[in-house]
Curated annotation (Swiss-Prot):
Family: Belongs to the metaxin family.
Post-translational events: Ubiquitinated by PRKN during mitophagy, leading to its degradation and enhancement of mitophagy. Deubiquitinated by USP30.
UniProt main location, coarse: mitochondrion
Signal peptide: none
Protein name: Metaxin-1
Species classification: Eukaryota, Metazoa, Chordata, Craniata, Vertebrata
Keyword field: Isopeptide bond, Membrane, Mitochondrion, Mitochondrion outer membrane, Protein transport, Transmembrane, Transmembrane helix, Transport, Ubl conjugation
Function: Involved in transport of proteins into the mitochondrion. Essential for embryonic development.
Crosslinked residue numbers (Glycyl lysine isopeptide (Lys-Gly) (interchain with G-Cter in ubiquitin)): K38, K41, K78
A GO cellular component entry from the record: SAM complex
Source taxon at top rank: Eukaryota
Cellular compartment(s): Mitochondrion outer membrane
Presence of keyword Oxidoreductase: no
Ranges that cross the membrane: 164-184
Amino acid sequence: MAAPMELFCWSGGWGLPSVDLDSLAVLTYARFTGAPLKVHKISNPWRSPSGTLPALRTSHGEVISVPHKIITHLRKEKYNADYDLSARQGADTLAFMSLLEEKLLPVLVHTFWIDTKNYVEVTRKWYAEAMPFPLNFFLPGRMQRQYMERLELLSGEHMPEDEEELEKELYREARECLTLLSQRLGSQKFFFGDAPASLDAFVFSYLALLLQAKLPSGKLQAHLRGLHNLCAYCTHILSLYFPWDGAEVPPPRQTPAGPETEEEPYRRRNQILSVLAGLAAMVGYALLSGIVSIQRATPARAPGTRALGMAEEDEEE
C-alpha cells in the first residue's frame, strides 16, 4: 500500500487555516478536491522536507515545493478542480491568475512585509511568537529581506524610486484589480458557478489574508470590505471548507505519560540539532559583527547538558 501524500505548510492564525499565501492556496485547493492529504501545520520551515513551506511529499517519496507544481501533481492524481471547465473558462483562469500576480501580489507583499507598522505589529509579531527559539530571533527578518527582493522583481524596471510614489501606484492598481474581481464574481457562489475551481483557491487566499488580519495600516483592506460580494465569498469558503480551522498559534502537544514511543528518540535528536544549529548561527553572527571577541583566559568549565533543555515546540496538528 502506497504511503499517503503529506503536505507541510505554515500553521494558522487570524482566523485562517494558514497565515501564508502559498500554503493557504494549496490547502484550499486540496479541500476543494477532497485530496487525501496528511497535513502538517508547522511554524518551523526547517522541519519541512524541502526546507521551505509549503511542500508536498508524494506517495512515492518525491518532494515538491512550488505551489503550482503541487497543484499540478494533485491533478495528475485525479484531484482536479478544473475538470468541468470549458476552454474559455480555462483561458479566463490563466488571465485572472496573471492579473492576481501582477496587480495584487505586489501590494500584498507591501502590506504585510514592507509597511513598517503592519510588519512590526502584525507580521513579525505572529512569526516571532509562533516560531521556536532561536529561529524567532532572525528568521522573520530574513523573510522580510526575501520579500523585499521579491517585490523588486515583481515591480521590474518600472518600480518608482520614491517610496510614496511606489505605494500610491501599487495600491491604485490593486484597488482596480479587486473591483474587477468583484464585478466578475457578481452574485455567483464561485467564479465559474456553483462549484469551486483552482482560480477560487488562489483568489480566496489573497482576499482572506487581507480581510482577516487586523492591520493597523489597512488602506486596501478598507476598499475590500466595501466590496460585499467578495467578503461574503470569503466567509462562505471559510465556513464550508474550514469550519474547524483558523485557530491562533497551536498549543504545544501534550506528551503522554508512559513508555517512550518509537519516534521519541528521533524527535529529541531533531530538537537538539535544531537548538545547536540556531546557537551556532547566533554565535557566528556575534563573532563576525564584533559583538563578541575572543581573548585568551583561563579555560572555563563547559556548560552542562541542561543548557540544551529548551527545544522547539511541536507545532504539528
